[in-house]
Amino acid sequence: METTKPSFQDVLEFVRLFRRKNKLQREIQDIEKKIRDNQKRVLLLDNLSDYIKPGMSVEAIQGIIASMKSDYEDRVDDYIIKNAEISKERRDISKKLKAMGEMKHADVKAE
């Protein structure tokens, strides 16, 4: 009975994909943290604008706050999009890894 060993290139590809999958998972967690942080900043700026009094050069302060809030909201949106893209790539890699494992398992059973 002959056993088919995966080629060296197959093993390297499997390791490369597995490492990429793990790296993507870490990036997802990092981005989720950034999303939370920026959402907190948006809330902070909302609350801050409630405390600004008319005697404090309201137009200038409110303009700055609106600009900062917009920047943070844009960052949150960018992180959400990036997270979705990374999640999709991670799912694709998981499918490839699973298929590679199933092919190896099928090759072993065929013998």
Curated annotation (Swiss-Prot):
GO terms for cellular component: cytosol. Keywords: Coiled coil, Cytoplasm. NCBIfam families: PRK05423.1, PTS_reg_TmaR. Residues 14-41 form a coiled coil. Pole-localizer protein involved in the regulation of several cellular processes. It is found in: Cytoplasm. This is Pole-localizer protein TmaR. Belongs to the pole-localizer TmaR family. InterPro entries: DUF496 (IPR007458), UPF0265 (IPR053375). The gene is tmaR. It comes from Salmonella arizonae (strain ATCC BAA-731 / CDC346-86 / RSK2980). HAMAP family: Pole_loc_TmaR.
